[in-house]
Amino acid sequence: MRYITAGESHGPQLTVILEGVPAGLTLAAEHINKELLRRQKGHGRGRRMQIETDTVEIVSGVRHGVTLGSPITLIVKNDDFKHWTKVMGAEPISEKESKDMKRTITKPRPGHADLNGAIKYGHRDIRNVLERSSARETTVRVAAGAVAKQILKELGVEIAGHVLEIGGVKAKHISNLSIEEIQTITENSPVRCLDKEVEQEMMNAIDHAKSSGDSIGGIVEVIAEGMPIGVGSYVHYDRKLDAKLAGAIMSINAFKGAEIGVGFEAARQPGSKVHDEILWDEEQGYTRKTNNAGGLEGGMTTGMPIVVRGVMKPIPTLYKPLASVDIDTKEAFQASIERSDSCAVPAAGVVAESVVAWELAHALVEQFGKDRMELIQQNITQHNKYAKEF
């Protein structure tokens, strides 16, 4: 499976085309809209989320609520486009009209794609860069993730995400929660945190950053249960599932790090405390005493829960802008200001769920049969029986 997205932040719409989704998957707009709404929530979001009412339109690949096996096209309209029709229109405009708009951007923002992208593509108006590099694009990545989650659900895999840290405020580790319990708690938290004791402290940190014209980042974690043993590969570097998951996390806007299992903590412990001892019994088959590997060894699943974390830096658009240089005059200026969030970590957690879900669904479809859901389900059932008796 693969997908490609298109569209600009203030353009008419965002589009994603999904290829390779098996036939026979139950899929309706409500499944996708639920995920889009989750992305819009979270303490610290900016005014843009008050403007947009993200809903999906399914325009191909689905008939009467069931996927056909052909490419699926999903569209999300940008409600704010009505205020940007001239600025972001596709038709040519005169030089006078261009000057009258006064929205040309020549002062790149530190931390964004602005300067590097302008140099790469030769854009003298940095808006040509920021409109596409904007995290608004993650709207349709969440839509794609919603389709992947539906695949996982029908294949017996559950997934959930939560926030571990915001602006240096850390949640304590809470173990032995089911995926359903994690989902219930986080859906009722403004910061998608499991630890109610630090929830308000996280919100206070966000509010302080906002009032100071600043921004803060954090850490999110995604957990998936129900993956069969041996999904992925040790044979080639580009088929290792842990590599794909880390790459997916790093592809999210403003993410600067990824961990699987105990992650970087493994460097501080001896092997005897890191590696997960193997157990077997007639009821469960092969299992592990611990899950420090985060459900992945040698690029393949172990059958234990997948545990992936991502580190999000503070959003680089600041209302108290940093120093920059005008690309036309080369004079020192403060960077341009665009409407933005003070903290998007809770929303980014939803995006992280989506990209992890896509990689897991892709791996299952690739390994157990590509064409139709019924065949994939049968093959997974047979594989699980085989693995248990191996």
Curated annotation (Swiss-Prot):
Presence of keyword Transferase = no
Cofactor annotation: FMNH2
A GO molecular-function annotation? FMN binding
Q: What pathway does this protein act in?
A: Metabolic intermediate biosynthesis; chorismate biosynthesis; chorismate from D-erythrose 4-phosphate and phosphoenolpyruvate: step 7/7
- Print the keywords alphabetically: Amino-acid biosynthesis, Aromatic amino acid biosynthesis, FAD, Flavoprotein, FMN, Lyase, NADP
- Family as reported in the entry's similarity comment: Belongs to the chorismate synthase family.
Quote the function comment for this protein: This reaction introduces a second double bond into the aromatic ring system.
Give the protein's recorded name: Chorismate synthase 2
